[in-house]
Amino acid sequence: MSEEKNYELWLDNYFFKPNFWQKCLTFVLFPLSVLYAFFAILNTFFRKKIVFKKPVISVGNLSFGGNGKTPLCKAIAREFDGVFIVLRGYKRKSKGLFVVKNQNEILCTLAQSGDEAMEYAFEENIKGVIVSEDRVKGIEKAFELGAKIVVLDDAFSKFHIKKFDILLESKIKPYFNFTLPSGAYRLPKIYEKRADFIALEGRDFVRYSFVKENPKAVLVTAIAKPFRLYEHFIKARACYFFKDHYEFKKEELENLLKKHNCDTLMLTFKDFVKVKDFGFKCQIIELNIELKDSLREKIKTYIKEFEQ
């Protein structure tokens, strides 16, 4: 198995399993973390709370990178009817509000939506997907289009929106409890107390992934924390990791397949939506989450408050 060393993997090690020199860098950068935390906290005050008449659920995390927000949002959509997903649309080549999907019809391009939004759009149980830097406008548009429930992807820090906050707590925790850049936290860890529900893997949800072994496949991925796929590394002939949200080029993928004499790309669905038009044979790594009763019942109780 080969491995492309890059910035994304360096960040994984820096935040979660630092070596001696990375630990030294952490303390050099600590004054910047204090400033970052100050302004992050300041940004959570002095804004009027906006309340909606229908359920708004936020799935977020405090730490940098992916913790499974996308599969958890999908799991909620499988459990409840009429779910629209609203997200920022990170790394998209557009600005403003775009309706990516409405009632099972995809309405824009990958460039306009971004990879995460397009991944949601291919999920049958999700009735609509909207990207917008302004989450309030996105929520309003979703309800206008008939959403029964809005699920916000990565909106824990939007404290001006009245919502049910689910905070994902991964089994793999940052090495230091500092905010960026000396630690992985985007808000001070004490902000966990502002969550309505802290979802712990194993207790509140079960994460599972599957892909068949294929010696003629090259695993390529551009997701945060690629070590989440560790169990699948040995199932492909070679593995290559790219920066989160990386825009794959057809020629470079062709070269990787030729280099290892392979005919198949092994990738996550988030990666697949970016290469599906290239004509490659693809093998999808299934990444799913199943809700356990503790989380499912909390969400049901919250939704029932709007039925009274």
Curated annotation (Swiss-Prot):
Reactions catalysed: a lipid A disaccharide + ATP = a lipid IVA + ADP + H(+)
Pfam families: LpxK
Enzyme class, spelled out: transferase
GO terms assigned for molecular function: ATP binding; tetraacyldisaccharide 4'-kinase activity
GO biological process: lipid A biosynthetic process; lipopolysaccharide core region biosynthetic process
Record key words, sorted: ATP-binding, Kinase, Lipid A biosynthesis, Lipid biosynthesis, Lipid metabolism, Nucleotide-binding, Transferase
Annotated EC: 2.7.1.130
GO cellular component: plasma membrane
Pathway the protein contributes to: Glycolipid biosynthesis; lipid IV(A) biosynthesis; lipid IV(A) from (3R)-3-hydroxytetradecanoyl-[acyl-carrier-protein] and UDP-N-acetyl-alpha-D-glucosamine: step 6/6
Annotated ATP binding sites: 63-70
Matching HAMAP family: LpxK
Function: Transfers the gamma-phosphate of ATP to the 4'-position of a tetraacyldisaccharide 1-phosphate intermediate (termed DS-1-P) to form tetraacyldisaccharide 1,4'-bis-phosphate (lipid IVA).
Family that this chain belongs to: Belongs to the LpxK family.
Name of the featured protein: Tetraacyldisaccharide 4'-kinase
Gene symbol of the encoding locus: lpxK
